[in-house]
Amino acid sequence: MSSSNSPIDDLLREFADEAPGYLSSAIVDMENGMAMASYDKAPEFDSSIAAAAFTNFIKSNREALDLLGADPLDTSDILVTTNGMYMLFRELGVEYYFGVAMSQEGNLA
């Protein structure tokens, strides 16, 4: 869990308390893959590892779109589903993205 007390960290904690199935969320710097703010509700979920890994995933998405002749920054959201969770990523301009992980009992709406 994040020990920081920034307003963004507080906002992520509020979101965690109100979102059924919440596991983790982070706002991540695309350049270095480090979370600028994060909150993990599930002790087994480490958002710092996920932030680094999914930064590469989002960069790969941008590269693929560029190769296809599409605008690499035209992605609204990226949704990844597994047997146990949903992960939703939203790019926040060029430099950051927001990622959230929810159990399948949760609701992304």
Stretches with model-predicted labels:
Residues M1-L23, E31-A109:
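Acidic, low-complexity cytosolic segments
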Residues V28:
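N-terminal glycine-rich anion-binding loops that anchor highly charged ligand groups
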